[in-house]
Amino acid sequence: MSFSVEVLAGIAIELQRGIGHQDRFQRLITTLRQVLACDASALLRYESRQFIPLAIDGLAQDVLGRRFTLEGHPRLEAIARAGDVVRFPADSDLPDPYDGLIPGQESLKVHACVGLPLFAGQNLIGALTLDAMTPEQFEVFSDEELRLVAALAAGALSNALLIEQLESQNMLPGSSGVFEPIKETHMIGLSPAMTQLKKEIEIVAGSDLNVLIGGETGTGKELVAKAIHQGSPRAVNPLVYLNCAALPESVAESELFGHVKGAFTGAISNRSGKFEMADNGTLFLDEIGELSLALQAKLLRVLQYGDIQRVGDDRSLRVDVRVLAATNRDLREEVLAGRFRADLFHRLSVFPLFVPPLRERGDDVVLLAGYFCEQCRLRLGLSRVVLSPGARRHLLNYGWPGNVRELEHAIHRAVVLARATRAGDEVVLEEQHFALSEDVLPAPSAESFLALPACRNLRESTENFQREMIRQALAQNNHNWAASARALETDVANLHRLAKRLGLKD
């Protein structure tokens, strides 16, 4: 069997029929799998010494979420280095990255593999991988025929990446015009909710508008901020991060605007604040709703006039900073309650974005699980970490109140448990390895909350009571210290000091 002109023409026609790049990629690998009668095919994009799956056929869905580093996958490294068709014999010593990831064949290892590196000029932009359980499956196809397939795939991928680059406004005035692959943002997901979010990010990234990013705790608001910065003209300058919830009131102004020597006790030298550090770049203010009203007023002035004053200095400094802010609060309600300035809210929310909770993202759960499985595999030096069909169903049926962060922790914990019960360096995650509960923050009973040991003196009893109150407040507020301080009706700086004295933090 060999490729006829009709077969190659059919592949080219399928590429043109697709609606959008993703559809074309899927048509390409599905057609190739049919033509070559193989068990699995995948189109991968190359970036920063790793391969990122764009489309798959015949492989487990979580493959789309995995990131295959060259260091962790010697076969893919061989493909990247070869510059031509690479055939791996059935008895190859190099492990296949898809072992255990072909549905229905989880316990079997791939026997035949062909790798086709894809180039745009001299630049490696991706690879096409073809796998079969039959050792001699690809012997009937010549290298020249496979090179023709690679050329078709490379053309489709190169055009798609170039168009994506132009649409994202990464080809800015004054740039060299040379093709450069877009950086990976780790925003994994193909659900309608995530697709819409990515489109909105592309729209706003190239502008200079301030952006307010909303969403529940653990949804990935910081990744959204990174994607906006990365797609903006400011990407060559720094993205500076500040968690407003972790700022004691006494140092918050200095952290934001800097201070001069002698401004206060301990100010032994001049110090730049976050706004100065982010000059000509982007400042990401996480948990913006935790700022005091006094600091909100000073932040508003910077947004209005573009100048700052260091603490202890009468002079103003001009800064050119784009502000991205994130919160898990409903700032409209905070405005109505008098805890957030309405004028600052309107300044920040010129282009609001909402990061969907994981429970609304459908099969993205499996893609993200694949990503975290691959991370664990590399970190623990395992040959493979895969999800059983039962584990996939279990993850899809769970509500994920803690969102992506909870999923990450659940995968890491499951890998450790599975590794402890299985010899060797291959881990299969089963349903029983996940101890998932919708009651992430159980309400304590009055008895357990107020119970004190009977044999304590007054001081020890008081400290135990304080310790328990702080623990409960942190649990009920997602370990947010500022929110816990409000719940306990105390200053956040005092809460930090008390927690340290009680041994609750270092």
Swiss-Prot record:
What ranges are recorded for DNA binding? 481-500
Biochemical pathway: Nitrogen metabolism; nitric oxide reduction
In the UniProt record, does the keyword Transcription regulation occur? yes
Residues noted as binding ATP in the record, renumbered to the chain: 215-222, 278-287
Keywords from the named record: ATP-binding, DNA-binding, Nucleotide-binding, Phosphoprotein, Transcription, Transcription regulation
Q: Which PROSITE patterns match?
A: SIGMA54_INTERACT_1 (PS00675), SIGMA54_INTERACT_2 (PS00676), SIGMA54_INTERACT_3 (PS00688), SIGMA54_INTERACT_4 (PS50045)
Record's SUPFAM superfamilies?
Answer: GAF domain-like, Homeodomain-like, P-loop containing nucleoside triphosphate hydrolases
Checking CDD domains in the record gives: AAA
SMART domains, per database record: AAA (SM00382), GAF (SM00065)
Record-listed 4-aspartylphosphate modification sites: 57
User: In this protein, which residues make up the domain named Sigma-54 factor interaction?
Assistant: 187-416
Record-linked InterPro entries: AAA+_ATPase (IPR003593), GAF (IPR003018), GAF-like_dom_sf (IPR029016), Homeodomain-like_sf (IPR009057), NorR (IPR023944), P-loop_NTPase (IPR027417), Sigma_54_int (IPR002078), Sigma_54_int_dom_ATP-bd_1 (IPR025662)
Q: Does the keyword Phosphoprotein apply?
A: yes
Gene Ontology MF terms in the entry? ATP binding; ATP hydrolysis activity; DNA binding; DNA-binding transcription factor activity
In the record, biological process GO terms are: phosphorelay signal transduction system
Q: Which HAMAP family match?
A: NorR
Q: What does this protein do?
A: Required for the expression of anaerobic nitric oxide (NO) reductase, acts as a transcriptional activator for at least the norVW operon. Activation also requires sigma-54.
Could you identify this protein by its name?
Answer: Anaerobic nitric oxide reductase transcription regulator NorR
